[in-house]
Amino acid sequence: MTPNRPSGLPVALWIALVTASVTTAVVLWLTDWTLGVPGEWSWERIVHPAASRWDSLLGGLQAGLTLGCVGLAAWFGSRLMARQSQPRALSQLARAALLLGLVASGFLGMQLLLHSLPPGHGIGRSPWVLYYPGSSGYYYEARKVTSLEDFRQSYLEVLEDPDPHRRTLHLGTHPPGLFLAHLAVREACRRSAAVRDLVLSWQPYRVRQAQATILEGGRPIPPVDAAALWLATLLTQLTAVATAIPIYLLVRVDHPYRTAWRAASLWLLVPAVAIFLPKSDCLYPLLATTSIWLWWSAIRKGGHSKAVLAAGLTWIGLCLSLAFLPILALAAGLAAWMNRQGRFNRKQLTAWSLASLAGLALPTLACWLTLDLNLLSIWSSNFVNHAAFYDQPQHPRSYLPWLGVNLLELAIAVGIPLAGLAASGLLRRLGSGQPEAAGPAWTCLAVWGLLWLSGKNMGEAARLWLLLMPWACWLAASTLDSLRSRDWALLLALQAALVLAVVGRVSGFDFAGG
């Protein structure tokens, strides 16, 4: 896809983005409007007491400097990526190094950003989020495992539990992958004193403070659990920021290096990632985006092995959460679209489909034969139990109000500037007349639109749709293609300012203090 001549964003779009961003900040900080649907679900605001105003100010300055440095790295890298004079081998090596540097800066920036928040809301919340059943529950269940067979039996019993309250919570609505992943992390810390000691030596003071409040029988949790909780936090954060790599590769299939860099850089400034770390939802974008990149690359450039690998990664994702079902729908939609446009003939489509089916079916069959786990039955039960969640009287939901709220919530969670770029890119793609450009636009719009209208996520869309948010970076690429350097810098500044306003005010969890 050939980029257009560098130009600025339309004045009307700039006015809309700035106005919407300022309005968002005003509503969050100067009003007490409910962040959700009253009486059903809403997000809590982070309170900045008058007695702690000075600490809040210092935290805001730290967050601002951190986001400024991340934005500067994104801007500087964009200039370097635009250079084409280096020899090819050196150029590829330099770009790979820059991309790894972007991930490293994102990881460090996320740490500093979370450290800037008040106690109980930033980095110190991580052990509470991962340990307590109310906010997660996967680790809590994993630490009770005495053997894999016992876990299998208890897990299958919960799926069919007659008590709907127990059946519709984490254990009954999720496949066993997350529980087993936390078990693996805990076992690594239990069996290796070196790993345990190294992880504990990296713990910030606020994390140690928070862990000291987690009591079992009046005693603090043992070092094994303290290390496992912090290691799981670090791995989740690294996985979240590393999503920039598959975003870069996905955009690079059809766009120049600089555009791919810009799209990847924007991922580090998505507010939802910082708000919901270290929830498991932050793990999903890496797997989901890598799968889409491999599938789209196989469609555009060929390679059956890519389709097999993409399906295998999606299978891993489905073992973690049914949230990966839209990824399958998107991949199928892309293949069908390109076939209909004559860019992916029937023979190629058949081979791609068989390769994808093999990547999904073979590990499913292997689990059934070796572990006696019928994943198809488990996924079906998870789906039914999740649907039953909204039938419980303590979880009332109204369909129509959530349609509007979810749109607003998604725009703020992604970041108003990025959401505006995605909308602009969507319109450009739809009007381009190029099947390769219009395909991702139509399929992303169709899959997300059906998910939105289905009402499957009435509440917490900002968290539950995290694995779909890289699509905004992908769609925005069509606008980023022609964005001149000055406008790119201003856009980064606006996105960073919105992150500062949202992350400093919105809590993704219903607890505070300590």
Residue ranges of model-derived segments:
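Hydrophobic, aromatic-rich transmembrane alpha-helices
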Residues: 1, 70-83, 409-435, 441, ...
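Membrane-interface helix-loop-helix junctions at transmembrane boundaries of multi-pass membrane enzymes
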Residues: 9, 83-90, 303, 342-350, ...
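Membrane-lumen/periplasm interface segments of specific transmembrane helices
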Residues: 21-38, 330, 334-425
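Transmembrane-helix motifs of polytopic, lipid-linked glycan transferases
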Residues: 71-79, 206-214, 230-254, 288-290
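Perimembrane helix-loop-helix junctions
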Residues: 89, 292-309, 325-358, 430-432
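Interfacial juxtamembrane loops and adjacent helix segments
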Residues: 114-173, 177-230
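Membrane-interface alpha helices of multi-pass inner-membrane proteins
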Residues: 268-275, 306-322, 328-333
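Short acidic/glycine- and proline-prone juxtamembrane loop motifs at membrane-interface regions
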Residues: 272, 276-284, 461
